Amino acid sequence: MENKGFELVSTYKPTGDQPRAIQELIEGLEQNKKSQVLLGVTGSGKTFTIANVIKAANRPVLLLSHNKTLASQLYSELKDFFPNNRVEYFVSYFDYYRPEAYMPNTDTYIDKTTKSNWDLEEMRMSTLNSISTKRDTIVVASVASIYGALKPKEYWSAFYNISIAQKISRKEFLLDLVQRGYKRNNVASEPGSFNAKGDFVDIIPAWTKGFHIRVEFFGDEIEKISTIDSNNKITIEKFKEYLIFPASAYTAPTGTIEAAVLRIREELHQRLEYFEKEGKLLEKQRLEDRTRNDLESLEEFGFCPGIENYSRHVDGRAEGEQPFTLFDYLPNDALLIIDESHMMIPQLNGMYNGDRARKLNLVNYGFRLPSALDNRPLQFHEFEKYEFQKIYISATPSDYEINQAHGEIVKQIIRPTGLLDPLIEIRREQNQVEDMFDEIQKQKAKKQRTLILATTKKVSEELTRYFQEKKEKVAYIHSDYTTFERNEILRKLRKGVYDTVIGINLLREGIDLPEVSLIMVLDANKESFFRSKKSLIQIVGRAARNVNGRVIFYANNISKSMEETIYDNLDKRKIQMDYNKKHNIIPKTIIKPITEAIEDKKLNESLISFMSHSKTKKSIKEKEALVKDLRNQMLDASKQLNFERAAELRDIILELEAN
C-alpha cells in the first residue's frame, strides 16, 4: 500500500489552546489511548487542530459527521489543508430516498423511491479505492458508513493490474473488463463502460470524470497504457503498469452470484412452506412472485432491483451475522474521529432499531425474505467492537464519550480571534416582553441583530405578532418553512432586512451569524431537551462570533442546567480573558461575507416568487426551468468544492420537485 505521508498546507500557525491540544492528542495516540475527547468551544479552530494531529499520526483517517451539510464543510476544509493527499467524501448517494415499507393497518405498500446522485456514487467508489491502496487517505463520512457494503475481499479480488508487454489478447482483456462490471458502449462515454475500436480500448472509470484509461494493443500484447483528459483528449500520463478498479462498488464475481442464488432458493422454499402451514396464502403468493422475478434477473444479469436485500447471501454471511461496512476497508491502525460526538453517537446508536422495525413488516407480510433483515446498519455494540483509536470532538461531549476517555478531556477554550464566550444575564419573567422590546431598540441603535428562542410555536407566533404590530422588523422561523425560506430569512437577518428572528430551535447545523450579538432565551429554567445544559451551552455559543455577544436567560428561578451553564461560561471567560491580557490580544468580531445561495439574481427572484405562491398552480415548464437552473448551479458549486452551497441547493431542488 502506497504511503507518502500527509502534507499539511496552511498559512496558519497553531495559536491559543491549539498547540497544547495538538500535543496532548498526539501523546495520547502514542500512548495507545483507545479514546480521547477534544472539548472545543465554537470558533476555536478544532478542524485545524485535528489537521495537525492527522499530519503527525500519519495513518488513514475516517472522520464521521452527523449530517451531509457539516460533512461537506469538513471535506472542503480538509481538502484545503491536504491538497497533495487523498481526501474523500462518503455519504449516501441518494439525493432523495424513501425506503421500502408496508403499513398493515391501511394495507399500504410503499415501494422504495430513490433519486441517485452519480457524483456522490463516484466519490464513494473513489473512497473505497483510495482507502484500499493509499495510506495517506482521509475519509469524511456520514452515518452511511455503518450501512452494508460489499465484502472487502470480494471487492479487492476484482482489482485488475495490467502492465506493458503483458501477454493477453484483446478479446481476453475485454472479457476481463466485463467480469469486473464494465459494459461495452462504443457510442456514449458513460461511467463504468469501455469502447473498443481497432487496437485501442478506452475505459471510462466509475470513480472519476477527469480522465479515461487508454490501453493499446500490438497483437496479443499490451503496448501502451495512458490516461487521457476527458475534455481535451490530451494524454495526461503514460504508465508501465496500471491498477484498474471495478466498475461498481457492488461488483461481485460470477461464482459468488451463482452461490447466492442457490441459498436464496433454499430460503424461499422454507419460507413458502411456513406461509402454507400458517394459512397465509396471500403472503405466500406475494413472496413467491417477487422473489422468483429477482432470481431470474440475478441469473441472467448478475443483478436485480433491491439486490441489497440479498446481501447476506451474496456475502455468504450467517443469519444475524454482522454486515460488512466501510469500517472493514480500513486498516487496523486507522484513526477514527467523531465530530459533534454528542449528536453522532446517538445517531449511530439509533439506526439499527428503526431499520429493523420497518423491515419486520415487509418480512411478516411476504414482501421480503427474512434474510432482508440482515441488510442493515451496524448495531451499536458492533460499532464499538472496532478497535480503532478514537477522538471525539464536541463543545458539549456526553457522558458516553467522557467515560470512554476515562474522564480525561483535552480542552480548547481559547479562540484565535480572541473572542470571549458571551456574557450571561438572568432576568425575571415579569414584563419580559416589554424588556425584550427595549433590548431590541438598543440592538437597533448599535446596528446589531437579535435571536429570541421560545419553547412553543404558540408563544413564538404571539411574540412575532406583537413585535410586528410595534412596527419591528421581525421574522419567525418554524418547522413548516422550506430550507430555502429558512435560509433566506437568516440571510435577511444578517443583511439588516430583519433586526430580530424568533424561533424554537435555531441551533440547526450551519448557522453562523456574526451579526447576532444578543440571544434572549424564554423559559430558560424549564428543564427539557432544548433547555438542557448541552443545549444552553450550544445556544450561548451562537453569540460567540461577535465581540459584544450577550445572552439573557428569562427565568424566575435557576434550574440545575442553567447553573451548570453559567459556571461553565464563567470558567471559560476567565481563561479567555487571562490569555488575552497576557498576550495583549484585542477581540474582534468575525467578518464573514453574506453570500446568496442562488447567485443568479433573476433566478433568485423567480424562486422567491414561486415559493411565495406555492399554493397556486404553477406551470410545469416554469418549475422545470427553475430546477434545471438550480441543478446547474449545484453542479458548479460541487466542482468548486463549495459543498455547503451545493448541499443547500440540493435541498431546495428536492423541495421544489415535491411542491
Swiss-Prot record:
<dbReference type="GO" id="GO:0006289">
    <property type="term" value="P:nucleotide-excision repair"/>
</dbReference>
<dbReference type="Pfam" id="PF02151">
    <property type="entry name" value="UVR"/>
</dbReference>
<dbReference type="Pfam" id="PF00271">
    <property type="entry name" value="Helicase_C"/>
</dbReference>
<dbReference type="InterPro" id="IPR001943">
    <property type="entry name" value="UVR_dom"/>
</dbReference>
<dbReference type="InterPro" id="IPR041471">
    <property type="entry name" value="UvrB_inter"/>
</dbReference>
<comment type="subunit">
    <text>Forms a heterotetramer with UvrA during the search for lesions. Interacts with UvrC in an incision complex.</text>
</comment>
<dbReference type="InterPro" id="IPR014001">
    <property type="entry name" value="Helicase_ATP-bd"/>
</dbReference>
<feature type="domain" description="Helicase C-terminal">
    <location>
        <begin position="432"/>
        <end position="594"/>
    </location>
</feature>
<dbReference type="InterPro" id="IPR006935">
    <property type="entry name" value="Helicase/UvrB_N"/>
</dbReference>
<feature type="binding site">
    <location>
        <begin position="40"/>
        <end position="47"/>
    </location>
    <ligand>
        <name>ATP</name>
    </ligand>
</feature>
<dbReference type="InterPro" id="IPR036876">
    <property type="entry name" value="UVR_dom_sf"/>
</dbReference>
<protein>
    <recommendedName>
        <fullName>UvrABC system protein B</fullName>
    </recommendedName>
</protein>
<feature type="domain" description="UVR">
    <location>
        <begin position="624"/>
        <end position="659"/>
    </location>
</feature>
<keyword id="KW-0067">ATP-binding</keyword>
<dbReference type="InterPro" id="IPR001650">
    <property type="entry name" value="Helicase_C-like"/>
</dbReference>
<feature type="domain" description="Helicase ATP-binding">
    <location>
        <begin position="27"/>
        <end position="414"/>
    </location>
</feature>
<dbReference type="GO" id="GO:0009380">
    <property type="term" value="C:excinuclease repair complex"/>
</dbReference>
<keyword id="KW-0547">Nucleotide-binding</keyword>
<keyword id="KW-0227">DNA damage</keyword>
<dbReference type="InterPro" id="IPR027417">
    <property type="entry name" value="P-loop_NTPase"/>
</dbReference>
<keyword id="KW-0742">SOS response</keyword>
<dbReference type="GO" id="GO:0009381">
    <property type="term" value="F:excinuclease ABC activity"/>
</dbReference>
<dbReference type="GO" id="GO:0003677">
    <property type="term" value="F:DNA binding"/>
</dbReference>
<dbReference type="GO" id="GO:0016887">
    <property type="term" value="F:ATP hydrolysis activity"/>
</dbReference>
<feature type="short sequence motif" description="Beta-hairpin">
    <location>
        <begin position="93"/>
        <end position="116"/>
    </location>
</feature>
<comment type="similarity">
    <text>Belongs to the UvrB family.</text>
</comment>
<dbReference type="InterPro" id="IPR004807">
    <property type="entry name" value="UvrB"/>
</dbReference>
<dbReference type="GO" id="GO:0005524">
    <property type="term" value="F:ATP binding"/>
</dbReference>
<dbReference type="InterPro" id="IPR024759">
    <property type="entry name" value="UvrB_YAD/RRR_dom"/>
</dbReference>
<keyword id="KW-0267">Excision nuclease</keyword>
<dbReference type="Pfam" id="PF17757">
    <property type="entry name" value="UvrB_inter"/>
</dbReference>
<keyword id="KW-0228">DNA excision</keyword>
<dbReference type="Pfam" id="PF04851">
    <property type="entry name" value="ResIII"/>
</dbReference>
<comment type="function">
    <text>The UvrABC repair system catalyzes the recognition and processing of DNA lesions. A damage recognition complex composed of 2 UvrA and 2 UvrB subunits scans DNA for abnormalities. Upon binding of the UvrA(2)B(2) complex to a putative damaged site, the DNA wraps around one UvrB monomer. DNA wrap is dependent on ATP binding by UvrB and probably causes local melting of the DNA helix, facilitating insertion of UvrB beta-hairpin between the DNA strands. Then UvrB probes one DNA strand for the presence of a lesion.</text>
</comment>
<keyword id="KW-0963">Cytoplasm</keyword>
<keyword id="KW-0234">DNA repair</keyword>
<dbReference type="Pfam" id="PF12344">
    <property type="entry name" value="UvrB"/>
</dbReference>
<dbReference type="GO" id="GO:0005737">
    <property type="term" value="C:cytoplasm"/>
</dbReference>
<dbReference type="GO" id="GO:0009432">
    <property type="term" value="P:SOS response"/>
</dbReference>
